[in-house]
């Protein structure tokens, strides 16, 4: 890739990964972000020049400008590049260009679990094939990075459905974890439009194999809608109707055990990640690896080394009011994700009381899923509800934190982190496990709690 490329919004995890990948593939790379952070420091350590002011950036010196969704069309650097006729590509459009440098690409998409599933497959392939690479939306714990370029053989990518940008991509393999109602403004609040976009994605000429979870209603709807016979379509799940069925799921000493029935063979696996949903995610990756020709024994040995992705069920031990307490930090922010996480906590800690500290994320999500929140938020033994993290949205009347728990009783409303800690100091002991959850800044609460 012999190009000079400027990355705008390079302090974000997605664009920073593309900048690193481009550099490792031979491009001359520079980046801009208004605020320096850990990611920009990492890029500078790799020899990438970072600008924090538009002043001094000679846009005319670049062949391509790549920008994140956080960069407005009116941004001076983007406007200048367009006026000069320089090729300007949104993040996913550039990822599509980058993919052409690789022989084979596998895209993971879905409303929930795509980052975790991408990290599982990335960890497997990096052990099974030293020339495999990945670009995903979270820090893969196995590599302590969201990006690794080991060669140009196989590439694992996370394909984002939230803004429909996955339609820019042309992979050979697609894994769909689920299809659910979220980011519906992208799809004009139409479920049929959402399904049509997924159909368009898997119908691309490049796509040869499709794996989808038949336990999910959205995936079943896609199967019913999709009728092309020129692709290899494989369903997986706990359902007896799955092409590859999962069974014998259980936990021993905090290790998840399960079996799958693959082409007439019964194959057993162990996984460090908790919950039925992670078994579903892992199964998709296992099947993809088996179909690529990797040996069962090698996949099984690689799978037990999978540790997932940062902020997905991260485990800590904290001392709270003199008690050693297990604390879990998790990114889940949708009712389905909340329910799955609480179920996983129950499976792993069946004899402990669950205290759920939840920070809702976006007023629009509160509003759009207002009927689904009460059931999900009733599943823990004790709910501590924080104010909604706005993500720069304006407050919507009837969609604040207290509105999503209407009809529930026994929950505690905290007006901030200090208030939540006050409740935790009263409630937590060795017989409790604390799930701290949300996509905003609630992860900081984990750090604030006493070591």
Curated annotation (Swiss-Prot):
Look up keyword NAD and say if it applies.
no
Name any one Pfam family assigned in the record: Mur_ligase
Q: Which GO terms describe its cellular component?
A: cytoplasm
Give the EC number(s) under which this enzyme is classified.
6.3.2.8
> Which InterPro entries does the record cross-reference, listed alphabetically?
Mur-like_cat_sf, Mur_ligase_C, Mur_ligase_C_dom_sf, Mur_ligase_cen, Mur_ligase_N, MurCDEF_pg_biosynth, UDP-N-AcMur_Ala_ligase_MurC
> Per its UniProt entry, which superkingdom is the organism in?
Bacteria
Catalysed conversion reaction:
UDP-N-acetyl-alpha-D-muramate + L-alanine + ATP = UDP-N-acetyl-alpha-D-muramoyl-L-alanine + ADP + phosphate + H(+)
One example of a Gene Ontology biological process annotation: cell division
Instruction: Indicate which residues the UniProt annotation says bind ATP.
Output: 110-116
The molecular function terms in GO held by this entry are:
ATP binding; UDP-N-acetylmuramate-L-alanine ligase activity
Q: Which UniProt keywords apply?
A: ATP-binding, Cell cycle, Cell division, Cell shape, Cell wall biogenesis/degradation, Cytoplasm, Ligase, Nucleotide-binding, Peptidoglycan synthesis
What NCBIfam families does this protein map onto?
A: murC
The record's HAMAP family line, in alphabetical order, gives: MurC
The Swiss-Prot or TrEMBL record describes its family as follows: Belongs to the MurCDEF family.
Q: What is this protein called?
A: UDP-N-acetylmuramate--L-alanine ligase
């Amino acid at each position: 890739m012999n190009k000079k490329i400027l990355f705008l919004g390079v302090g974000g995890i997605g664009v920073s990964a593309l900048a690193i990948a481009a550099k490792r593939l031979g491009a001359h790379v520079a980046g801009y972000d208004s605020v320096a952070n850990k990611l920009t420091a990492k890029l500078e350590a790799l020899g990438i020049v970072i600008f924090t002011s538009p002043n001094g950036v000679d846009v005319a010196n670049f062949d391509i400008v790549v920008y994140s969704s956080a960069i407005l069309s009116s941004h001076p650097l983007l406007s200048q590049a367009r006026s000069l006729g320089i090729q300007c590509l949104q993040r996913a459009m550039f990822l599509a260009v980058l993919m052409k440098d690789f022989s084979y690409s596998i895209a993971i998409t879905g409303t929930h679990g795509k980052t975790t599933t991408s990290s599982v497959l990335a960890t497997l392939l990096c052990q099974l094939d030293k020339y495999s690479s990945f670009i995903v939306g979270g820090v893969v714990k196995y590599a302590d990075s969201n990006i690794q370029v080991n060669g140009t053989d196989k590439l694992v990518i996370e394909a984002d459905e939230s803004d429909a940008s996955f339609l820019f991509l042309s992979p050979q393999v697609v894994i769909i974890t689920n299809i659910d109602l979220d980011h519906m403004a992208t799809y004009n609040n139409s479920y049929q439009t959402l399904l049509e976009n997924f159909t368009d994605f898997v119908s691309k000429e490049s796509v040869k194999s499709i794996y989808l979870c038949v336990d999910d209603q959205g995936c079943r709807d896609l199967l019913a809608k999709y009728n092309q016979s020129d692709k290899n379509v494989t369903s997986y799940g706990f359902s007896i109707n799955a092409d590859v069925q999962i069974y014998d799921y259980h936990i021993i000493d905090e290790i998840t055990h399960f079996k799958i029935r693959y082409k007439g063979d019964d194959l057993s696996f162990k996984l460090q990640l908790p919950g039925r949903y992670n078994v579903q995610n892992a199964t998709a990756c296992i099947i993809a690896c088996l179909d690529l020709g990797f040996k069962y024994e090698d996949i099984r040995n690689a799978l037990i080394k999978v540790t997932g992705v940062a902020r997905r069920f991260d485990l800590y031990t904290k001392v709270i009011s003199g008690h050693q307490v297990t604390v879990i930090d998790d990114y889940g922010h949708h009712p389905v994700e909340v329910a799955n996480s609480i179920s996983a906590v129950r499976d792993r800690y069946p004899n402990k009381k669950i205290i759920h500290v939840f920070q809702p994320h976006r007023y629009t999500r509160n509003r759009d899923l207002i009927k689904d929140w009460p059931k999900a938020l009733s599943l823990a033994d004790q709910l501590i509800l924080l104010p909604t993290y706005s993500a720069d949205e304006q407050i919507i009347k009837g969609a604040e934190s207290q509105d999503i728990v209407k009809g529930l009783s026994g929950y505690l409303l905290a007006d901030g982190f200090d208030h939540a800690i006050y409740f935790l100091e009263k409630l937590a002991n060795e017989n409790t496990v604390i799930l701290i959850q949300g996509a905003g800044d609630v992860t900081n609460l984990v750090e604030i709690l006493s070591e």
